[in-house]
Structure formats: C-alpha cells, structure tokens
Amino acid sequence: MVTLITEKLQSQSLDDLTCKAEAGPLQYSAETLNKSGRLFPLELNDQSPWKVFSGGPPVRSQAATGPDFSFLPGLSAAAHTMGLQWQPQSPRPGAGLGAASTVDPSESTGSSTAPPTKRHCRSLSEPEELVRCRSPWRPGSSKVWTPVSKRRCDSGGSATRQGSPGAVLPRSAVWSTGPTSPATPRPSSASGGFVDSSEGSAGSGPLWCSAESCLPSTRRRPSLSQERLAGAGTPLPWASSSPTSTPALGGRRGLLRCRSQPCVLSGKRSRRKRRREEDARWTRPSLDFLKMTQTLKNSKSLCSLNYEDDDEDDTPVKTVLSSPCDSRGLPGITMPGCSQRGLRTSPVHPNLWASRESVTSDGSRRSSGDPRDGDSVGEEGVFPRARWELDLEQIENN
C-alpha cells in the first residue's frame, strides 16, 4: 500500500495538478488521471449529473442536456481514447482539482459547532490527521465493494494550494459543511465517477478550507475507506503505532494480560498453594516420634514393649495377656496380688512373655522379698538384665 502511494506521488505531484487547474478547462487523459491517484474514470449516471457552481456545493441538474463530463455511462474504455474534460460553468482562479477547493474562505458561512469532547469509539471518530490523507474519489456501494474501516492515519500529508496564488492549506485543515448542506447522506449516484467530492457534496462531502474560517463539523464519517488514504505522503501509521497515535493503547497498560502471560499468574497461584501446604504440615502428624525412638532404643528383643508412662490400671490386662494364672483360677480374671510362682507356673512360651512379666509382676516380687529386686523396682522394664534372669528361672522351674 505504501509503495503504491509513493509511486503515484512520484509520477505526478500536487503542484502539477494545481498549475494545470489554473490554466482553465483542460483535457486529462485516463492515463494521467490513473497515475495521479486523485481522479479515476468511473461510470456516471446521466440522469443525475452534478454541476459545480462557484462558492457553493454542487447542484444537481435535472436536465441531462448540459453534463459537465464528456463521456457516457458504461464507456470507460472510450475514456482512454477521447480524454476527459472538466469544465466548471464559471471559470474562476480558485477552480482546482484533487484536494483543491473552489469555495472561498469568506463565503463558507455554514453553521458549524465545536467537535465533541470525547471520542467514544475510534471507528466513529475522524481525527484531524485523516483530512490530509483523504482522496476525493470514492466508489459507490455495491454488492462487491464495501467500505472497510481503517486505523487512524497519522501521516503528515503535503499541503495543497488553492487556486489563488499564495493561499496554502495548513496542516491542521479540518472538515466543514456547506451553507445549504442537509443532514441526509450522500446519494449513491454521486458516490461513483468523476465527481470531485472536495468541491463539496450535499451534506457529507469534505470541503478544504483555510485555518481562518474552518471549524470541525459535528457530523463525522463512521468508516474510512482505503481510497481516502491514497494521498498520504509518508508511510502509514500501523507499521509503528504509539499511544499518541492510538489513544486506546495507553489505557491497556495497566490491565492484566491473562492470555498473553499465563506463566506469571500460574506462578503466583503455585506460591499461594505452597504456603498453605507449609502451614498444614505442622498440624498434620498425629504420631509421637519421641515414644517411637525410645522404644527402638531400649528394646533388645522382638516382643519387648516398654511402656514407661502406663498406670497401674493397665497391669491386670497385661498380666492376662502375658502370663495367665494356673488352671485353678479363671484365665480372664487375674489380680496383681497373686504369687509370682502362680504367675510363672504355666507359661506357654516363656521367652515371649518374659518381658511383660517383668513389667506386670512388680507387686508380687515386692511381696516375695527378692533382694535383687529392691534396687531395680522401677527399672525392670527398662534394663534387660533382670529379664534374662527371669527367663533362666522359668527354664529351671519347667
């Protein structure tokens, strides 16, 4: 797109068009018009030709007797051979082509107010930079061609001269409507062909004017066609957009970009989960590791279970499990006051139950008055020396 625009601008500049326009009614061949990028030979409806009058918008003449253009509708091929004539009815020095305007700045007295303060939508707003890029030719809306909205044009177009010498358009040229322009949209018959929309077209056509009398119009175009950007002299802005050229980009900086940065958000979530796991890890264990280490340290046999913190209420149960009394008493009812010999009379496996007897028969040994048990009354379950002696006594008794 940029290369096409550059080639068109190199082939014929705006100054050539202005100089030829000041010479009066001239003949333009189709090749020259195609190279200029300003005017294109398209079909015109002979029932509604548009005539340009000096100092006002173009007026539609009902009679087809005096058309402004010398070619007939549908004969675009004939336009290449015969050439095209553009004849305003009253030739003025201000009659120009392309971006030149025939409206005198003193005559544009149309009621125009200030533009809206806020641009609610970029497609509905038309910035001042687009005025420099607008091309006057626009094809009519049809089933094949539909205008496509473009991004805002930030290119600084070259200033074009009006017909009067010395009057140069400023860079901040804006749109204004004619004095008798209604609010109705432009008819489709005027959209196509050789009608110079810069001359002013009923309501929506642009008018080029100087900075003294031009004010931006309240009505703005909703779409920007590709042909309006044909007159740009610099590369188009979508190659490198900035927050100044596109104000919508500035507000997006503070927003979260979840789709483009998923790893950052996932890392934050994982860190929060790890903190929760660390907090729950300290309340999680329900086992007493101190007791487990003490049991493993003090046990010398597989069946030794040393409970240092047990009360005396658990001793009869352990006595029942370890060594029941003789067959004369009930096996399930065993008191801690029974004799030590009665506890040792009928052990099924003396080696297995030896450690538990040492724990549960403290009271019986106290009654028997064994001198060896006086020093280690509370330490029988901890030290295995007394346990091995008890095992030897059980073997001798059996």
Curated annotation (Swiss-Prot):
Record carries keyword Phosphoprotein: yes
An individual GO BP term: protein import into nucleus
Annotated Basic and acidic residues bias: 123-132, 363-375
Polar residues: bias regions: 103-115
Low complexity bias: start-end ranges: 176-193, 234-250
Region Disordered, residue ranges: 85-253, 336-398
One term under GO cellular component: nucleus
Sequence motif: Nuclear localization signal, positions: 268-276
InterPro entries for the chain: FAM53 (IPR029356)
Localization per record: Nucleus
Keywords annotated in UniProt: Nucleus, Phosphoprotein
A Pfam entry, by short name: FAM53
Major localization class: nucleus
Residue list for modification Phosphoserine: S125, S301, S304
Protein family: Belongs to the FAM53 family.
Function: May play an important role in neural development; the dorsomedial roof of the third ventricle.
Protein name per the record: Protein FAM53A
Species, as recorded: Homo sapiens (Human)
